[in-house]
Amino acid sequence: MERGKKKRISNKLQQTFHHSKEPTFLINQAGLLSSDSYSSLSPETESVNPGENIKTDTQKKRPGTVILSKLSSRRIISESQLSPPVIPARRPGFRVCYICGREFGSQSIAIHEPQCLQKWHIENSKLPKHLRRPEPSKPQSLSSSGSYSLQATNEAAFQSAQAQLLPCESCGRTFLPDHLLVHHRSCKPKGEGPRAPHSNSSDHLTGLKKACSGTPARPRTVICYICGKEFGTLSLPIHEPKCLEKWKMENDRLPVELHQPLPQKPQPLPNAQSSQAGPNQAQLVFCPHCSRIFTSDRLLVHQRSCKTHPYGPKYQNLNLGSKGGLKEYTNSKQQRNRAAPSVTDKVIHATQDALGEPGGALCL
C-alpha cells in the first residue's frame, strides 16, 4: 500500500513538472525538503552525501532541479532599469557678444569679437560728435564662489550691448545710432502733436545722414537734348550719337512740310542748369487743332486721334486773329439762325393747322 501511494505521488509531481511552463529544477537543500520526504516523493533518486558513492537507477536518470519563479526575474529587470544612462549635452552653451548682443558658439565668439569691435569703431567714427560713444569694455562676471559663470557672463554682455542703444526723442524706443535716422522718418508719437524741433535739428539730421549713408548717393543724371530722357553722366556720351542717328531716320520719314532742322547741342552754362532742360524747343510743333505741343514725329500720331473743332473745317481754317474773319463767321451764323425756324414755331404752326385756325392765336 505504501509503495503504491509513493508511486502515485511521484507521478503527480512529474505531471506537474511536465505541464508547468516555467523551467523547474529540484535540489536537495536543508530546510526545503527533508531527506525522508524527498526520498518518499522521488523513489528513483537517493540523497547525496559527500564521501559516499552515488547510487542511481541506470534506467532513469534525472538531474537535480531548481524552481525559479517569474517574480524573481521581473525584480532583476526592474532593478537594472532604476539607473538610466546619463546622456551628455549635445553642444556647449552659447556666448553673447558684448558689442552687438548676438549669440555665438564658444569657439566662434573668439573670432567674432575682434571683427565686431573693428566694425564698431568704423561706425562710431562716422557719427556726429554728440552721438559718439566710448568703446565698450568686455565685462568680467564672477560667481559667488569666485569662478566664472556662463549665465552671469551672458547677462553682463547683454547689458553692455543694450547700453549702446539711443532712445528716440518722440516715442522713447531705443535704436542703434545708424537705425535711429530710419526710425525718425516714420515715427508718429501717439497722443502728441508734432515733436519739438531739435536745437540743431538741421545739423543733427545732416550729421546722421552723413554718418549713416553707408551706400553712395544716386549719381547725377543728365537730360538728352534730342529725346529729353535722363541718363547718367557716363552713359550719355554713348547714347547721344545713337539718338541723333535715330532722329535723322525718323525725320526723313516725315512729310516735307514737317521736316525739322538738325538739333544743336546746347552749350553748358556755368550754373549747370542745362542738365535740367528738356529737348530742344526748335523740335516742338504746335497742333493746329488743339494747340498742344508735340515733337514732329509724335504730331502725326496725335492728329489721327485729335478731336477737331465741332464747327467743322471752315472754323479750323479760319484765322481768329483777324477781326474780319471773326465778323464774317459771326454774320454767317446769325443768317443761319434767322433762316432756320425754331422748334417752337414748328409746333405752333402744326397746332394751328389741326384746329383750322390759320394765323389765329392759340389759347391754352
From Swiss-Prot:
Its domain of life? Eukaryota
**Per UniProt, which keywords does this protein have?**
Metal-binding, Repeat, Zinc, Zinc-finger
Zinc-finger ranges (C2HC/C3H-type): 93-122, 164-193, 220-249, 283-312
Q: Would the keyword Zinc be found if you checked this record's keyword annotation?
A: yes
Q: Where does Zn(2+) 3 bind?
A: 224, 227, 239, 243
* InterPro entries named in the record: ZC2HC1A/B-like, Znf_C2H2_type, Znf_C2HC_C3H
Q: Which cofactor does it need?
A: Zn(2+)
Q: Which Pfam families match?
A: zf-C2HC_2
- Tell me which stretches of the chain form a coiled coil: none
Q: Where is the composition biased (Low complexity)?
A: 138-147
**Presence of keyword Nucleotide-binding:** no
Q: What is this protein called?
A: Zinc finger protein 474
* Gene transcribed to yield this protein: ZNF474
